[in-house]
From Swiss-Prot:
One of its GO terms (biological process) is carbon fixation. Residues 221-347 are annotated as: C-terminal beta-sheet. Belongs to the RAF family. This is RuBisCO accumulation factor 1. Disulfide bonds: none annotated. The keyword Acyltransferase does not apply. PANTHER family: RUBISCO ACCUMULATION FACTOR 1. Keywords: Carbon dioxide fixation, Chaperone, Cytoplasm, Photosynthesis. It comes from the Bacteria. Has 3 domains, the N-terminal alpha-helical domain, an extended flexible linker and the C-terminal beta-sheet domain. The 2 C-terminal beta-sheet domains are swapped and pack against each other to form the dimer interface. Homodimer. Forms an RbcL(8)-Raf1(8) complex. Each Raf1 dimer clamps the exterior of an RbcL dimer, protecting it. The extreme C-terminus (residues 354-361) inserts into the catalytic pocket of RbcL where the Glu-361 forms a salt bridge with 'Lys-202'. This insertion probably contributes to the assembly of RbcL(8). Forms complexes of many stoichiometries with RbcL with and without RbcS. RbcX and Raf1 can bind simultaneously to RbcL. It is found in: Cytoplasm.
Length: 361
């Protein structure tokens, strides 16, 4: 009799047990906020979405993002040589402050972390410090009198802004800020010079950013997977994965080989739960005042499999997909409902449209 080996541990069970343990620790607020951020990041990588984690632990999605990013910044502080006092301070508080340092490099984060700890700043001031350091890092040659220390970067920002103000109150506030953060003596002297030099240096205003907004649903397209060109088999229709959109821009993530098409946000398409598209020709459907058959994009909602007598459906006909209308309920399964037939854009004369002057006339 063959002796069976002991049951090997199931990786899926082990992963699920670990996830449940992390959820329990988060629910009971065990550990510090850095560990919470690492636990939430691990859960999200395992497939838990922020809403699931919120319902299981009470951590709101915004808070989840803050502690995840903050814990990553804290790790940068550890690896890049932040002081022990800084690390000890931020291990128990300040996720909102470290979150604001996320756009800096690892080395800049460590230096900025020490600076924010030394000056006991809040999140709003940390955001300004991060911006000052980021802007200062773009200089190939350092401004006269200022070193590459993050304190001098903040001092330079204050010095530059103070020179643009004629209002003495605002100018004095910025000078005080610069003196507070200045690290080098030369930077301090540059700022102190503003106490006797009241010259105002005007700055060219930044251009208006090219913001656009989607005003209607039609303007925001829906990305739909393409099954392929007929003839196709039922298995090919079923093999296309269900698409999950990420709001607010309907972002679609996918790994692997898959064709996609962007369609306008028509209401019937927005209402579809599981739409896919199939490339076909119009002669597969009854003629609708058309002289020549042409290509069409058939949009099918795989979630709608209930028969009615006023719709077309996709079915498996002798091993291949087909589109049919049924006067009575069919005896075989329905694979989806045809919700839209899209014809290509009509171009009257392609040669004419290449020359805009001909169209204008």
């Amino acid at each position: 009799m063959t002796e069976l080996p002991p049951n090997a541990p199931n990786p899926e069970n082990a992963t699920n047990e670990l996830a449940q343990e992390l959820l329990r620790k988060l629910r009971q607020k065990q550990g510090n906020w850095v560990e919470w951020g690492q636990a939430i990041a691990s859960l999200q990588k395992s497939g838990y979405n922020p809403q699931d984690i919120f319902e299981a632990t009470g951590f709101e999605p915004v808070q989840q993002n803050q502690v995840i990013v903050g814990s990553q910044v804290y790790n940068s502080l550890e690896k890049s040589g932040a002081s022990a006092a800084t690390l000890a301070h931020y291990a128990t508080r300040g996720s909102d402050v470290l979150y604001e340092l996320r756009l800096l490099t690892h080395e800049e984060r460590a230096a900025a972390g020490d600076l924010t700890f030394t000056h006991k700043v809040d999140a709003d001031e940390a955001r300004e410090i991060a911006k000052a350091i980021k802007d200062f890092s773009r200089f190939r040659i350092l401004p006269e009198g200022f070193s590459n220390h993050p304190g001098d970067a903040v001092a330079y920002q204050a010095w530059k802004l103070a020179r643009q103000y004629s209002d003495l109150q605002e100018r004095s506030r910025l000078i005080a800020r610069g003196l507070r953060f200045a690290h080098s003596e030369t930077a301090r002297k540059q700022i102190e010079q503003l106490l006797v030099d009241f010259t105002v240096v005007s700055q060219r205003p930044a251009p208006i950013p090219p913001f656009f907004r989607f005003d209607t649903e039609d303007e925001l397209p829906r990305i739909v997977p393409v099954v392929g060109q007929l003839p196709l088999k039922a298995e090919e229709l079923k093999a296309v994965p269900l698409v999950e959109e990420i709001e607010p821009f309907r972002l679609v993530k996918f790994s692997g080989e898959q064709a996609w098409v962007a369609l306008p946000g028509w209401q019937v398409l927005l209402a579809a739960e599981d739409p896919v598209t199939i490339l076909a020709t119009s002669d597969r459907f009854p003629k609708q005042n058309q002289t020549e058959p042409g290509p069409v994009l058939v949009v099918v909602d795989r979630s709608q499999r209930e028969w009615n007598d006023f719709s077309y459906f996709v079915v498996d006909h002798d091993g291949e997909l087909d589109f049919q209308w049924f006067e009575t309920k069919p005896e075989f399964p329905i694979l989806g409902k045809v919700i839209i037939l899209v014809r290509p854009r009509r171009i009257l004369d392609e040669n004419v449209t290449k020359d805009s002057w001909q169209i204008d006339e």
